[in-house]
């Protein structure tokens, strides 16, 4: 695995990046995959473009999460939840994204609830208690196949699994 994009976070420093710096960035393969979904099939993305977006999205995540973390600390809570992130986005001026993300978060919570409920029923049928893992009754696939969020003219999709 020494040659994977993930070892240096795919960043310009290559093998010279500290472990702490590597942890700051999303894996370049994930960033590239997301970028490709927004482009025509024959489009090419330069390494520099991937690295730039990688750094930007990682910084954005840190920015939003930091604000949400500050809120949780003030409220003496240890766990950041989706609502905290939406609050942080509003506070930091990204309110145009909040309503579509609320829809997305609601769908996600519904799917997670279905997975938990179905896993519990599956465990009861087998005589076990609760059950975990993939037990949604359909090979681990959730009952809701995916979500589509449209924000400022851009559509974002996610398949919950």
UniProtKB/Swiss-Prot annotation:
Residues 1-23, 114-146 are annotated as: Disordered. Ubiquitous. Expressed in seedlings, petioles, hypocotyls, reproductive organ tissues and leaves. Residues 26-32 bind DNA. This is Nuclear transcription factor Y subunit B-3. It is found in: Nucleus; Cytoplasm, Cytosol. InterPro entries: CBFA_NFYB_domain, Histone-fold, Transc_fact_NFYB/HAP3, Transcrpt_fac_NFYB/HAP3_CS. Pfam families: CBFD_NFYB_HMF (PF00808). It comes from Arabidopsis thaliana (Mouse-ear cress). Component of the NF-Y/HAP transcription factor complex. The NF-Y complex stimulates the transcription of various genes by recognizing and binding to a CCAAT motif in promoters. Promotes the expression of heat stress-inducible genes by contributing to the formation of a heat stress-specific transcriptional complex with NF-Y subunits (e.g. DPB3-1, NF-YA2 and NF-YB3) and DREB2A at the promoter of target genes, thus promoting heat tolerance. It comes from the Eukaryota. Residues 128-146 have a biased composition (Gly residues). GO terms for molecular function: DNA-binding transcription activator activity, RNA polymerase II-specific; DNA-binding transcription factor activity; protein heterodimerization activity; sequence-specific DNA binding. The modification N-acetylalanine is found at residue 2. Residues 53-64 are annotated as: Subunit association domain (SAD). One of its GO terms (biological process) is positive regulation of DNA-templated transcription. Residues 8-23 have a biased composition (Basic and acidic residues). Belongs to the NFYB/HAP3 subunit family. Induction: Enhanced by heat stress but repressed by dehydration stress.
């Amino acid at each position: 695995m020494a040659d994977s994009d993930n070892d240096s976070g795919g960043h310009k420093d290559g093998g010279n990046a500290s472990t702490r710096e590597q942890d700051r960035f999303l894996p370049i393969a994930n960033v590239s995959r997301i970028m490709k979904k927004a482009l025509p099939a024959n489009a090419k993305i330069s390494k520099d473009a991937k690295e730039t977006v990688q750094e930007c999205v990682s910084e954005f995540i840190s920015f939003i999460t930091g604000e949400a973390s500050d809120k949780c600390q003030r409220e003496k809570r240890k766990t950041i939840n989706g609502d905290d992130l939406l609050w942080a986005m509003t506070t930091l001026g990204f309110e145009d994204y909040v309503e579509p993300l609320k829809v997305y978060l609601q769908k996600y919570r519904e799917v997670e609830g279905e997975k938990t409920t179905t896993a519990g029923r599956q465990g009861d049928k087998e005589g076990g208690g609760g059950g975990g893992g993939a037990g949604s009754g359909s090979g681990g696939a959730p009952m809701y196949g995916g979500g589509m969020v449209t924000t400022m003219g851009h559509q974002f999709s996610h398949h919950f699994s």
